[in-house]
């Protein structure tokens, strides 16, 4: 796993990832990262915090909200708890946030906003994994179906009711944009929950989200690809030998065996999956660095208007 948090710009494939600040001592993504001082603000005006940026406040509101705590009892793959080892959507969201902060830091993006979107990205999921969402979508078909991203927006803009002055968490435009669009532009007929809020506070749903939100989306992919393997091995749904038949994972196991020939089963599989995890993170950083260097964005709006994602796998 990558340990440093800044990259010398642009990424140079001949020397690999290098970390640090630019020649003027400033993070390289400064021009196109989301600046909290330039935020488009909240739907309901609030006094600024003495100690926290607006994105930090968003993150803290998400962590302390009821919906975030309820993620403890929701899963992605397994339909019910079969022990305390398997991931829940709460532990998954924490892992996504960790990966997202690392990538954002390397690319010079705003790590606070990236972490905030990562922590919020699963708030709209129902219980019982993907099967639960499919069942709920079928039941809600007469009312427009069910969409977990739209439900997440509904939760943070309406259903959380703790504050005296407004319903919801009154998050910044940038955080709401990231929750709604981290997987890309929202096209076609809008779910009513998203359409209702968008009429009040236009999230520009047809465009791409900030690079910070895009990082959160890819961090989600990295986290679940990695922990699904951990959980699947623990549940004995497949074996390490079956995983080693896959070329990328085969190289990970081979590297571990070459360096640590006498590891026990548990340590061997953990070391191999650590390497797989690192490969995914470094791939996103390398490809995204190249994309950003090619685009040479001068501000965050250049990212939104790019016409394609800037944060990608190879």
Task: Enumerate the language-model features and the residues they cover.
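Acidic, glycine-rich active-site loops and adjacent beta-strand->loop/helix elements
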Residues: 119-123, 140, 159
